[in-house]
Amino acid sequence: MQDPVEGLDGRAGLAEGEDSQLRPQAPDAQASSQNSATEGDHGNVPRSCPQDSGRPAAPGTLATPGSQAAPGSPSPGNTVGSGAAAEEAAVIPHSEQATLVPGRNGDTASTRNRHLEFSVTVPFRTAMEAGMARRSLVANARPQQVMVQQEFTANDSILAVRWTTDDPVLFRISINTFLDQLSLVMRNIQRLEFVAVVKRGRGRSRES
Amino acid sequence: MELSGEYVGCDGEPQRLRVSCEASGDADPLQSLSAGVVRMKELVAEFFGTLVEQDAQGLAEDPDDALDGDDEDDAEDENNSGRTNSDGPSAKRPKPAS
């Protein structure tokens, strides 16, 4: 009597196992329920047990593709990600080169295009003297403007002169010419002062 | 009083030339300034003299000169190859006599 009871318990256990395995997947659960009905019909035959053990393997094999699909789906994503990373890695050096090359070229261009500059500041005693010198020197410098750019600025009693050119030889010629003319202007200013003093002296002598 | 000059080259670095023009005692300030101008002329001549020499040396060491030399060598090679071609007919002339 006990033997039939044990047999029923075993079947019930198998059914529960199958149900628990198949519950996550509805189609598999339905298939297993049909199989279990068939098994119930052939329960008396002991040979059907190996077949039953073989059939549960099918759900396992079905589950395996699912498990494979799960890791499969991330792998393409990983590939895409690695591809994107590779693209980013490829782009970054390119962008860096793009940023560096213009900089280098810019530096080279700026270095090549940079003009030579020379400036002189002359401190006169008064703004009037600085103004007189500037007017005289500007007139003399006009013929040289073609080769060398000159800029004269009188700020109060300070005269500032600036040259710009590409050729250092022209620099030397132009600056030497300016300094010679500056000396001449200073002498003229001194003479004007001397003449003024003399005139004042004569005026005083007449008054006396 | 100070007479000053400043040079800025291709590298952008400023170089300054300074001449003091202090009047001593009752000396005329313009006279002192005139003396300063003379001194500045000397400094400018010295400074730009050195600069021009450096510029000339830079041109002499220009790599393009080496390339020009290579071009001359190539021209000589072409002349030599021409000479070799001219020898061809003279070698062939003895054959008709035999």
Curated annotation (Swiss-Prot), chain B:
Modified residues (N-acetylmethionine): 1
Swiss-Prot/TrEMBL keywords: Acetylation, Nucleus
Subcellular location: Nucleus
Keyword Acetylation: yes
Region Disordered: start-end pairs: 55-98
Residue stretches of biased makeup (Acidic residues): 61-79
UniProt KW Cytoplasm keyword: no
Gene Ontology BP terms: tRNA threonylcarbamoyladenosine modification
Domain of life where this protein originates: Eukaryota
Gene Ontology cellular-component annotations: cytosol; EKC/KEOPS complex; nucleolus; nucleoplasm; nucleus
InterPro entries: GON7_meta (IPR027893)
Primary role: Component of the EKC/KEOPS complex that is required for the formation of a threonylcarbamoyl group on adenosine at position 37 (t(6)A37) in tRNAs that read codons beginning with adenine. The complex is probably involved in the transfer of the threonylcarbamoyl moiety of threonylcarbamoyl-AMP (TC-AMP) to the N6 group of A37. GON7 plays a supporting role to the catalytic subunit OSGEP in the complex.
Assembly description: Component of the EKC/KEOPS complex composed of at least GON7, TP53RK, TPRKB, OSGEP and LAGE3; the whole complex dimerizes.
PANTHER family in the record: EKC/KEOPS COMPLEX SUBUNIT GON7, EKC_KEOPS COMPLEX SUBUNIT GON7
Protein name (record): EKC/KEOPS complex subunit GON7
Species for this entry: Mus musculus
Gene that encodes the chain: Gon7
